[in-house]
Amino acid sequence: MRRGLLIILSSPSGAGKSTLARRLRDWDTDIEFSVSATTRAARPGEVDGREYHFVDEAAFKSQVSNGGMLEHAHVFGNFYGSPSGPVQEAINAGRDVLFDIDWQGAQQITNSALSAHTLSIFLLPPSIRELRNRLEKRAQDDAATIARRMDKSWDEISHWGSYDYVLVNDDLDTTEAHLKTIVTATRLRRSQQPGLTEHVRHLQSEFERLS
């Protein structure tokens, strides 16, 4: 049995991260989505425990101080974090966990004890103009929020060099195909296959018997 992967997807808002995360899970339904904890209020249609674990600030900070968060960050006035228990359990059982997080969270995970099992991918927009167009077209935020997201976008983009792979999302289907290829190949890394050492020992024993 292989070890599970921590698959990190990061991008500035509007670069297609959430859409590609959904497509990746549609492709392989065994990939688990890391359900983050957040102090922000639930939006219409969101369900506690599905999109997020909605908690108050005191409960969130308590989890952080007790070592219960794999990563956490303060974004747009709210706290976000990934509870560590479910992630560790999934990795040990050979299940992949998908993270839709910013560069701060990605950095914390890649510097954690689970770094050997981490795959980090950054999504770049084809242009800043296209990034703004996508934010405006999705009609999810008001003008002030879009302006804040655009202000933050370059800070996010500036950390592209710390990721394992970087994809320019100028065509969603092409980017999806590249993403699947990367995940498939990374699952075959030697570090993800703990049974290989024992297999080679068996090969050595067989070789010695037949020699």
Swiss-Prot record:
Entry's localization field: Cytoplasm
InterPro entries the record matches: GK/Ca_channel_bsu, Guanylate_kin-like_dom, Guanylate_kinase, Guanylate_kinase_CS, P-loop_NTPase
Main enzyme class: transferase
Pfam families, sorted: Guanylate_kin
Domain of life per record: Bacteria
EC code: 2.7.4.8
Broad class of where this protein is predominantly found: cytoplasm
Residues of the Guanylate kinase-like domain: 4-184
Keywords, sorted A to Z: ATP-binding, Cytoplasm, Kinase, Nucleotide-binding, Transferase
Entry-linked Gene3D superfamilies: Guanylate Kinase phosphate binding domain, P-loop containing nucleotide triphosphate hydrolases
Gene Ontology MF: a single term: ATP binding
Catalytic activity from the UniProt record: GMP + ATP = GDP + ADP
GO cellular component, one term: cytosol
Binding site for ATP: 11-18
Membership in a protein family: Belongs to the guanylate kinase family.
Classification via NCBIfam families: guanyl_kin
Summary of the function given for this chain in its UniProt record: Essential for recycling GMP and indirectly, cGMP.
Protein name listed in UniProt: Guanylate kinase
Gene: gmk
